[in-house]
Amino acid sequence: MLGFAIALALPFTLFALFPSWLKSMPKSGGWMNVIKVTLGFLELAFALKFLSVADLAYGWRILDRETFLALWIVLFALLGFYLLGKIKFPHDDDDTKVSVPRFFLALASLAFAVYMVPGLWGAPLKAVSAFAPPMQTQDFNLYNNEVHAKFDDYDAGMKYAREHGKPVMLDFTGYGCVNCRKMELAVWTDMKVADLINNDYVLITLYVDNKTRLPEPVKVMENGTERTLRTVGDKWSYLQRVKFGANAQPFYVLIDNEGKPLNKSYSYDEDIDKYVDFLQAGLNNYNKKK
């Protein structure tokens, strides 16, 4: 939302500071309509992103990853053809000439659409990982190097870890967390990282913005104030704050079978070597406690 606000306010701010710039602007005409249509396509693309966050949080499953990508591919392909003059709208000029900047913008839009096509079969698409739904919503996936959580419930995951004698990796995340998606596709897809998480840890992913209602509201005390936990996300957010003193995502913490941290927590940092060291240090500390 901050990005939208800045983008809309910046032109007015600049023209207010430098009124003479208005004189150098070309008169309104077809070029203005092209800008409006282009921004309209971009607005639709970002609207789908925000809709996907709500879709995930409430569990509607309307916009799975491949559905989202298919819609984005269509939007950016249409934008590319529009900029090339192949598609006309009612208020567009009849001029068939395409300027050089407009041509390169069309080329970029079409290239972006083509880039996303492999994502329909499960390709990571790191460039759009911050916007697309998580990989686990993909129904058809030819790629098998992704990391998927064994549990999305803390108690069930801890019970499994105790029974199998493995340390636990808690992943506090959110459906609307951009940096979480970046970490999952930029770091977790590394073979060393994926091998450590899949084979040596029990991964429990807890979504702090999960809107699923709890069977019964739970009243808790936090900092001397009574709070009511009404959703699953409220429960995991409360757990993160009270047990680990943090409220940001992504937030990774390695714990033993008693729920005690094995080393320092880890937040957003796409350095793969650091992440491997973080996982290996936790595993070493767990083995020392045995």
State where each predicted segment sits:
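Hydrophobic alpha-helical segments characteristic of multipass inner/organellar membrane proteins
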Residues: M1-G157, H164, T189, L206
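Composition- and surface-driven signal marking solvent-exposed, interaction-prone regions
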Residues: M1-L2, W60-E66, D95-S99, A127-S129, ...
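CheY-like receiver
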Residues: G157-Y160, L239
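Thiol-based oxidoreductase modules, predominantly thioredoxin-like and allied folds used
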Residues: E146-F151, T173-Y175, L185-D234
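Flexible loop/turn segments at secondary-structure boundaries
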Residues: S24, L51-V53, G176-N179, K211-P215, ...
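Non-catalytic, surface beta->alpha helical segment in thiol-disulfide oxidoreductase systems
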Residues: V187-V193, N223-K289
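Loop/turn elements at helix/coil->beta-strand transitions in domains of secreted/extracellular proteins
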Residues: H164-V168, N199-I204, N247-P250, N257-K260
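Short active-site neighborhood of thiol/selenol oxidoreductases, capturing the structured segment around
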Residues: E163-R181
